[in-house]
Amino acid sequence: SRTAREVVGIDYSQAFIDAANGMRAAGTARVSRLEEASLQSELEVAVPRGVCPERITFEQGDAMDLRGDLGNFDRVLAANLLCRLREPAKLLARLPDLVKPGGELVLTTPCTWLEEFTPPANWPAADTSAWLKSELDESFELTAEHDEPFLIRETARKFQWTVAMLTVWRRR
């Protein structure tokens, strides 16, 4: 973190947490990326300058069942997560406890609701934006909403272009 006193990163994947902890400890990591077929290239990635890794912790966790003593924060980011949860409403219900009054909640989602991740009964009844407003309005005020494009490299010649909906909320 450059500015926050404390950052807690949580992911469901223990492999992602192990990789993040390795980067935090070493400052760099060697990674392989697929070029084509079975051809790979090696890269070295580094923690950006000015980041204070000693302020950051990483832990494995389930966004629908976060530990009770996690505390609350000035800012919470849930990135590209909602439409990958079996019960996304569970996370939304927990968010008021995680964000301090006056704090900020940032949600991004590509709104790609798929049965393999979320049963259709748990999808928004309307569009995702309207659903979020109805679920969060009691505890949060929507302060911004816009599209946030991102690109995922699959191979040297194949990329996945996606546009996520980004919403920013202020805790009442």
Annotate each predicted stretch with a short phrase.
Residues 77:
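A conserved beta-strand element that flanks and buttresses the S-adenosyl-L-methionine
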Residues 1-4:
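Conserved SAM-binding loop of SAM-dependent methyltransferases across substrates and taxa
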